[in-house]
């Protein structure tokens, strides 16, 4: 790590007074990008999603008198968290990962809405997931290009 003295021409024995030229301070966007691309954040998304799904299943079974659609919202958010974590785990999304996430989202909605897997989806329909698939594919291509340049 190279340093530049604070006062030009005067060397310093105290490295705290020197300004580092090798490390550029990160902007807010750079720090957020580093956080979002960290493995800990992605694993945290998956864990948070699992916790939301489990909490919703527990609440639906405990509170049968409440409208279950309000309790399904955390589960849907949890499933989306799980899928985002899975899709972004290595920086790109393969077609196999995307098909796995589509199956998870569709099955979780089926189980949450009426307890049976009968393809009665209203939120995660094939049309909506296919539309999202185009966005996922383009983001995946962009992320793989960024990874190749680094």
Swiss-Prot record:
<protein>
    <recommendedName>
        <fullName>Sulfur-rich protein, serovars L1/L3</fullName>
    </recommendedName>
</protein>
<dbReference type="InterPro" id="IPR008436">
    <property type="entry name" value="CRPA"/>
</dbReference>
<feature type="transmembrane region" description="Helical">
    <location>
        <begin position="43"/>
        <end position="63"/>
    </location>
</feature>
<keyword id="KW-0812">Transmembrane</keyword>
<dbReference type="Pfam" id="PF05745">
    <property type="entry name" value="CRPA"/>
</dbReference>
<feature type="transmembrane region" description="Helical">
    <location>
        <begin position="69"/>
        <end position="89"/>
    </location>
</feature>
<keyword id="KW-1133">Transmembrane helix</keyword>
<dbReference type="GO" id="GO:0019867">
    <property type="term" value="C:outer membrane"/>
</dbReference>
<feature type="region of interest" description="Disordered">
    <location>
        <begin position="1"/>
        <end position="20"/>
    </location>
</feature>
<keyword id="KW-0472">Membrane</keyword>
């Amino acid at each position: 790590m190279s340093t530049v003295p604070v006062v030009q021409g005067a060397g310093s024995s105290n490295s705290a007074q020197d300004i580092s030229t090798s490390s550029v301070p990160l902007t807010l966007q750079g720090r957020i990008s580093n956080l979002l691309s960290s493995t800990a954040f992605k694993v945290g998304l998956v864990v948070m999603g699992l916790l939301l799904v489990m909490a919703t299943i527990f609440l639906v079974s405990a509170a049968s008198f409440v409208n279950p659609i309000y309790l399904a919202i955390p589960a849907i958010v949890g499933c989306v968290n799980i899928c985002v974590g899975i899709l972004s785990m290595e920086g790109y999304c393969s077609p196999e990962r995307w098909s796995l996430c589509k199956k998870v989202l569709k099955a979780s909605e089926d189980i949450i809405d009426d307890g049976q897997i009968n393809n009665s989806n209203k939120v995660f329909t094939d049309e909506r997931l296919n539309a999202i698939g185009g966005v996922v594919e383009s983001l995946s291509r962009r992320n793989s290009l960024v990874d190749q340049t680094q």
